[in-house]
From Swiss-Prot:
Gene: mutS
A Pfam family reported for this protein in Swiss-Prot or TrEMBL: MutS_IV
Listed name of the protein: DNA mismatch repair protein MutS
Top-rank lineage group of the source organism: Bacteria
GO biological process: mismatch repair
Alphabetical list of PANTHER family matching this protein: DNA MISMATCH REPAIR PROTEIN MSH1, MITOCHONDRIAL, DNA MISMATCH REPAIR PROTEIN MUTS FAMILY MEMBER
NCBIfam families reported in the protein's UniProt record: mutS1, PRK05399.1
Amino acid sequence: MMEQYLEIKAANPGLLLFYRMGDFYELFFEDAEIASRALGITLTKRGKHQGADIPMCGVPVERSDDYLHRLIAAGHRVAVCEQTEDPSAARKRGNKSVVRRDVVRLVTPGTLTEDTLLDARANNYLLALARARASSGVDRFALAWIDISTAEFMVTECGANELAATLARINPNEVIVSDTLHGDPDLGALLRELPSVTPLPRDTFDGATAERRLCDYFAVATMDGLSAMSRLEATAAAAAVTYIDRTQIGQRPPLSPPSREASGSTMAIDPATRANLELTRTLAGERRGSLLDAIDRTMTAAGSRLLAQRLAAPLTDTAAITRRLDAVAALTADGAARDDIRAILRTAPDMSRALARLSLGRGGPRDLAGLRDGVMAADQTLARLAGLSDPPEGIAAAMQALRGPSRELARELGNALSENLPLMKRDGGFVREGYDTALDEARKLRDDSRLVVAAMQARYAEETGVKTLKIRHNNVLGYFVEVTAQHANRLMSAPLNATFIHRQTLAGQVRFTTSELGEIEARIANAGERALGLELDIFDRLAAMAIRNGDEIRNAAHAFAQLDVAASFAKLAIDENYTRPDIDASLSFAIEGGRHPVVEQALKRTGQPFIANACDLSPPPPPVEGSGESGQIWLLTGPNMAGKSTFLRQNALIALMAQVGSFVPASRARIGIIDRLFSRVGAADDLARGRSTFMVEMVETAVILNQASERALVILDEIGRGTATFDGLSIAWATIEHLHESNRCRALFATHYHELTALSAKLPRLFNATVRVKEWHGEVVFLHEVLPGAADRSYGIQVARLAGLPPSVIARAKSVLAKLEAQDRGSTVRVLVDDLPLFAVTSRTGESAPTGETSPLIEALKSLHPDEMSPREALDALYALKAKLPKQ
């Protein structure tokens, strides 16, 4: 046996081997040690190998899904090795013959299908990543991602600078790459951020055989029947289906043909922005408190998954967004239809995942019932939607898809399945009585034999005088007679010992058998096996009917999800007083009465109101001389705790929700399409990469300044705060100028550097705004209103006092602040605004090199050490440098 184990283990390196032995999966050697630690189960030993004890642990087959889930969550992959013949067949080959075993499946994070292993509200993506190296040095990447539990299959292509954002959007559970790509130092940091990366041999990513492998998987002669793909996309797609073939071993899950996602069809959002805005998870990693949690009113698991997909990938096509908004508007206007549809959806099962399990031979009776109930829900939904006059395009398309599944299949399933269904088909009892005559006859014979056992138990109890005598059954002994230890001697003594044969002694019971009981057991076993065999045949026939109707079932499942999301957004709009946004191709960004969707709900739960605010980043009307009433960049100043960060985030979230196809938390919103969303909000270090908080901030700011186009929306909070005052002020100053002159994008910039407000005099599209506060008897009251103007102080000491700093520290801080304010730093900066030229737009590939000899001004600058200077010394040095400038 151990020789067989070692042979199978050698063929599956890097995976924990679940080796089937009877009712357990056993693990040996290092696998046992790893599993014992990960699962918290006892490590024992079994025999010896090369003179050393063999470590061993095991898990019961009936609970294996739970243990698999824990191992996968811990980052392990598992090979499941089953017995492929009956032990009796092995014995016929000889007493020392080992039962044949084979690996039937590789369980990896990206190839899960069982409900017990999956999050019902989230997709489970396997992603293949392929790279093409260009002679210009600019790499291109193709991504193919598949959820085998729902049959979704997508491909796209992107540049190296878009790769991180694309991976963050898809959020795969497992990524497969070539071993060459896995060892590439340029991608090392990015790959380490992913939850599970599996390197594969280079031939898995062989572009020359990609089309052949795809055609083979989908059983088509040419690629014409599949989506048009680039050669690189086909390479990634072929790698993905090849890996699925290898892990599913003989079970090829049906997949939808790959759908190609065009570049630029969705809003690009980098990983830092996703984290900062807490779209699907809070910074603490929790779903609760995220935007997804706040807006999710879906009734089905499939609807929740689709909502998460849409939230991760807002559209950039106005027509597609309008179609989504039209569906939401129709269900917002018709409250009765919305409520009725949501009530029907509450009963709709997860048809796509049920179908996937049936296709892979892992389904059960409840999956068949799910398909039956899904078709019934489709009929109910169609009947309710028929009352809509002129349904919008999105709802009409969903109605058409709901007509697809076979009603004959639903009727057959309704006739076949019983009321109370077991989880596993091997348990039997799922076919309705009267559906199949042969099955009914086998069941009667089986059940009548069981009545004979009950009568035999009563007779044995009477004959022995042991009223507590029981006839029981287990998989090891079969049927047996059981008595307590105090009555055992009676059965082991004459004359009863001629009838009762001793089989087993336990702590409190003794077990016996009889020749009569053995005969009855054989009859029951034969009848039971025949009944179960007939049921399993019926199950396979019904599953085959469902699989043949697979495309129609999957389309209907997607239609349910689309209706669920539309009805969810409609419910959200009514509950939270959201309004339909106007989306167009302009550069407008005009929000009236905007609110933060998450914070508003949190305040509502405590009975507090949320203060709504306007924001207009639309281009000012010509001429653009002066700041006008609005500008493309808002410079926001105000105290700590006043709500600046909330204001920044709420406008980003409003834009995102609008392009997802949701109504938005505002009284009015007009938004020109945003192609990229950038957020630099919050502070965190990255110790694993040796980055300080300030370094992380600068890296993220660099990405924004290098990539933001005029169609981007940028929100920046407290740029420059992590370094010396003048350094930070200078960086913030230059960043604003770059956004204004080079990126020319819509932006919100919050700062405590009040000196920067003077820039609005020179930058015509920079608009000053401030968060209003009120002082009352020495206390600061935060009004959370955003108004035109500039703050002259941050009230940091008042906030520090509210936080509980000792009174002595507060008093000293006030004294120091008074002396610093007496130096009137702000007026000096305003002089600089007048003296310094505007930001000069340079090539993004680098700055021009200085020419000529070093000037006295440069030498003087080199001699300065800003970190060692007091504010007064720095100011004096600045005047001295100004005096060295050539006279004009």
